[in-house]
Structures are given as structure tokens and as C-alpha cells.
């Protein structure tokens, strides 16, 4: 992937491709104006006065008319792109709601499916993101798929795109939002339509009942520690809404909004030292848990695929 998974120079969706084309055109148009103005400036400085006939015509044509024509053409083209990107969507459009928090992302699909810090969408199908924030201003940006759009308290913005290339793309908050702004990332996975349907069906299922005694002990420890006051795990009594939905947390590639790779070790470290690893986030550290309990809890969470 040219430039990596977070590069606007390698568009993987129609929205990003339009932004890329517009950027190139604006660069070329601006470069043409710059070159013309510099050439005329050099000519005016170096040429003898008698070799500079019709000075007013040169000033009007090169200094006013040429930039106005070029900039007007670029503006008309830009308006056309903006109108196309904001056109109403059809019935086949997948609608995904994203809410920004300090410092993580809540993602909701139709039929009650919820995830966090991970977005999965189908290739070749329009997707409309409705974005807002629960606290401060954030900015939702997936450079390889679309331009950025602000998330404003009390207001819903919309962004529509159609991804063409399956793959994993990285998104990032692009508006400074506090101490952990740089650690507020997310992954966007674009899947073929059949694989997306399988993924969505799997996400709709509640957490499986653990057959392993260690995993069952981890679940019980999770509930006893009060984690269910903030987190939801469908299929258990945990129904909190303050933090990310953890029903299928084990299937996510990263933890803490792209800060760490997912796994038993990372989960245990996060539970024990969330404030040390990501200071000022809203999850307290549970450093008083003994090692056995911590490992069991982390193993159970990792099993939630």
C-alpha cells in the first residue's frame, strides 16, 4: 500500500479518490498561477522599459484575468465534487453511527450491534457514517478512505463513502482533544460482502458461555470487580454504558483505541494499569487484583471472539 495504511496518497474509496484528484488539480492550478506571476515579475524586473509595451494590458491579463479564470474553474470543479460527495444515499446504504469519547470510539451498527475502536465495512457498498461526540470536539478521519469531518457536541455530521479495496485502513482523531489525543486511533477493515455478512452475524450473537473453569472464573471476577457497571457484555449481567461494549472484544486487533495489540498480556496489563498506560482516561486501574484473578479475567475477555 503506497504510503502505508494511513496515507491520503493511496485512496481506497471514492471519497478519498475525489479528495486526491482535487488536491492534484489545485496543486497544478496553483502552480500554474505561481509560475505565470513569477515569470511576469522576472520579466518586469529584467526587461528594459522600452521592451515592455502595453504595461496595463500585461498587468490586467497576467495579474488579474489569468488568476481569476484559473481559480474560478478550480472553484466550479470543487463545488461539483462537494455536491457529489454529499448527494443523498440509497436504500442499500449501510449506516454506521460513531460517537467520539475522550479517548476512544463507540461504533454502532443496525440491529443493536456495537463495537469500539474498530469499524468493519463491506467493499463496494455505500456506507454512511453519522458522527457526533459525547464530550469535546473530535475529528473523524480515515485518510485512505475519506476526508476528515468534525464531531461536534449536540450536532450530527454525515460522511458517505464506498470502499473499493479490501484491506485494513487506519483512522485517527484529527482535532486536538486532550492529553491522549495522539492515542485515539481506530482500524477500518474493508471486507468482501460475503465475509462482512458473516462478521456482522457473529457480532449479533451474545457472548458464549465459558466451558473452561478458568474462563468461567475470569467472567465471575469481571462481574465481581464491578466492571459491568461501565461495560456491556451481552449474554451476561454486565450492561454498563460508560465504556466500550466488550461482547466480542477478543476479536478486535487492538486495545485502548489503537494503543496496544490485543492479547491476554495486553488485556491484563490494561486492567491492572490503565491509568499508567494511558493517563487521564476514564478507566481506573485495578492494581489490587492478584495475578491469578487478573490472568483469568484477561483470558476470558480474550476468548470473547
At which residue positions do the language-model features occur?
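Residue-level detector of conserved, well-ordered beta-strand and adjacent loop positions
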Residues: 99, 174, 189, 247-250, ...
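Sequence context surrounding c-type heme c attachment/ligation sites in exported
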Residues: 185, 216-228, 237-245
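Extracytoplasmic entry segments of secretory-pathway proteins
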Residues: 1-123, 207-208
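The canonical Cys-X-X-Cys-His
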Residues: 173, 218, 224-234, 267, ...
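Electrostatic cytochrome c docking/interface patches
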Residues: 112-117, 194-223
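Membrane-embedded segments
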Residues: 102-106, 115-116, 120-192
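Short, non-ligating residues that shape and space the ligands of small metal-coordination modules
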Residues: 179, 236-237
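Extracytoplasmic electron-transfer domains, predominantly the class I c-type cytochrome c fold
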Residues: 201-213, 237-305
Amino acid at each position: 500500500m503506497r504510503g502505508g495504511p494511513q496515507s491520503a496518497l493511496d485512496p481506497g474509496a471514492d471519497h478519498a479518490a475525489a479528495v486526491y484528484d482535487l488536491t492534484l488539480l489545485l496543486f497544478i492550478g496553483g502552480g500554474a498561477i505561481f509560475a505565470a506571476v513569477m515569470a511576469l515579475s522576472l520579466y518586469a524586473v529584467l526587461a528594459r522599459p522600452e521592451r515592455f509595451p502595453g504595461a496595463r494590458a500585461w498587468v490586467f491579463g497576467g495579474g488579474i484575468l489569468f488568476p481569476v479564470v484559473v481559480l474560478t474553474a478550480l472553484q466550479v470543479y470543487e463545488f461539483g465534487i462537494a455536491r457529489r460527495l454529499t448527494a443523498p444515499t440509497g436504500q442499500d446504504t449501510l449506516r454506521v453511527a460513531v460517537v467520539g469519547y475522550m479517548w476512544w470510539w463507540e461504533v454502532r451498527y443496525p440491529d443493536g450491534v456495537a463495537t469500539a475502536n474498530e469499524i468493519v465495512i463491506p467493499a463496494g457498498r455505500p456506507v454512511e457514517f453519522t458522527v457526533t461526540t459525547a464530550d469535546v470536539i473530535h475529528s473523524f478521519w480515515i485518510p485512505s478512505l475519506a476526508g476528515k469531518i468534525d464531531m461536534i457536541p449536540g450536532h450530527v455530521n454525515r460522511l458517505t463513502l464506498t470502499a473499493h479495496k479490501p484491506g485494513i485502513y487506519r483512522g485517527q482523531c484529527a482535532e486536538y482533544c486532550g492529553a491522549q489525543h495522539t492515542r485515539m486511533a481506530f482500524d477500518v477493515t474493508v471486507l468482501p460482502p460475503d465475509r462482512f455478512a458473516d462478521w456482522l452475524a457473529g457480532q449479533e450473537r451474545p457472548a458464549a458461555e465459558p466451558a473452561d473453569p478458568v474462563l468461567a472464573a475470569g467472567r465471575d471476577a469481571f462481574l465481581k470487580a464491578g466492571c459491568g457497571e461501565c461495560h456491556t457484555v451481552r449474554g451476561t449481567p454486565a450492561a454498563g454504558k460508560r465504556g466500550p461494549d466488550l461482547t466480542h472484544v477478543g476479536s478486535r486487533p487492538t486495545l485502548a483505541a489503537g494503543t496496544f495489540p490485543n492479547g491476554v498480556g495486553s488485556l491484563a496489563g490494561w486492567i491492572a494499569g490503565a491509568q499508567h498506560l494511558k493517563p487521564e482516561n476514564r478507566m481506573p486501574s485495578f492494581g489490587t487484583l492478584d495475578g491469578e484473578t487478573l490472568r483469568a479475567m484477561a483470558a476470558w475477555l480474550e476468548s470473547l471472539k
